[in-house]
């Protein structure tokens, strides 16, 4: 598990490209046959990528979280961004197709991951886990791809028409603080979350997927009057502290998992920034 300490907005103007990427971009989250994890001290979020290619992969109990089991004091939302697979929690096995989401609550044990057909055309499952501390237990719940609360956003004329699926949220699958969903851009649209906004009470992470290998998303971050950018590839994640905008434009259409943790779960608790005020 890699640890990343929290940063302040005053640090960003002095960062070069390499430091921006080291602080906020998670490049090597998915590796076949392995579990890769990052612990960010922004709201104590843990990100993990799990890619089973043979036997089932167990979720480790990382020493950095100082718990008997991973879920002793935590909850998580998990989205499969690869081929079909299964997650076993407390002896019960859940089938996850591409884009499906499983919420796992505090106190869960015996969590393992398996690909249905790692050598098949769809390839191995790629499970993306987003975890935050939890004070109480909620039941493990599966949401099929395309389910949850659906919002149609944007317009083809502004190249930001997209479908947003809310999976784990205050009016959907219950959790302590994790909020999670998937947004998919329509063909011909390339912008996400523009006009941009910040969440002064929550950390948010974007995981980009479904992006062709030769394409990139130009992801904007930083305070609205002091923005920077990252070039992001398929399967990479960007950590957005509470003070940072999070928006991007791709060289092709794509999807992304958005997930938040912090003070509250209100989806619309955001501070909008007019485009003309960005710098």
Swiss-Prot record:
Question: Does the keyword Zinc feature in the UniProt annotation?
Answer: yes
Q: How is the cofactor bound?
A: Binds 1 zinc ion per subunit.
Which EC number(s) does the record attach to this protein? 5.3.1.17
Top-level taxon of origin:
Bacteria
| Pathway info | Glycan metabolism; pectin degradation; 2-dehydro-3-deoxy-D-gluconate from pectin: step 4/5
Pfam families named among the record's database cross-references: KduI
Example GO biological process term?
D-glucuronate catabolic process
Described by its record, this protein's role is as follows: Catalyzes the isomerization of 5-dehydro-4-deoxy-D-glucuronate to 3-deoxy-D-glycero-2,5-hexodiulosonate.
Q: What is this protein called?
A: 4-deoxy-L-threo-5-hexosulose-uronate ketol-isomerase
Query: Which organism's genome codes for this protein?
Result: Kineococcus radiotolerans (strain ATCC BAA-149 / DSM 14245 / SRS30216)
* The organism's taxonomic lineage, starting at the top: Bacteria, Bacillati, Actinomycetota, Actinomycetes, Kineosporiales
Gene that this sequence comes from: kduI
């Amino acid at each position: 598990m890699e640890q990343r300490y929290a940063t302040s907005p005053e640090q960003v103007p002095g960062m070069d490209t390499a430091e921006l990427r080291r602080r906020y971009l998670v490049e090597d989250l998915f590796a076949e046959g392995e579990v890769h994890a990052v612990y960010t001290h922004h709201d104590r979020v843990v990100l993990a990528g799990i890619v089973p290619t043979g036997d089932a992969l167990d979720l480790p109990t990382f020493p950095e979280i100082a718990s008997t089991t991973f879920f002793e004091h935590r909850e998580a939302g998990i989205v499969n961004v690869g081929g079909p697979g299964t997650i076993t929690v407390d002896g019960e096995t859940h089938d996850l197709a591409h884009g499906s989401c499983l919420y796992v609550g505090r106190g869960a044990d015996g969590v393992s991951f398996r690909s249905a057909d790692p050598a098949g055309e769809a390839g191995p499952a790629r499970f993306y886990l987003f975890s935050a501390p939890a004070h109480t237990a909620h039941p493990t719940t599966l949401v099929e791809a395309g389910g949850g609360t659906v919002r149609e956003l944007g317009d083809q004329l502004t190249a930001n028409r997209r479908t947003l699926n809310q999976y784990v949220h205050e009016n959907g699958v219950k959790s302590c603080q994790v909020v999670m969903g998937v947004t998919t851009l329509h063909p011909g649209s390339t912008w996400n979350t523009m006009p941009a906004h910040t969440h002064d009470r929550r950390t948010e992470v974007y995981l980009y997927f479904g992006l062709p290998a030769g394409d990139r998303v130009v992801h904007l971050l930083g305070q609205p009057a002091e923005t920077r950018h990252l070039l992001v590839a398929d399967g990479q994640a960007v950590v957005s502290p509470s003070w940072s905008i999070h928006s991007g434009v791709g060289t092709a259409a794509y999807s992304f998992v958005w997930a938040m943790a912090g003070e509250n779960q209100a989806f619309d608790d955001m501070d909008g920034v007019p485009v003309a005020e960005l710098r």
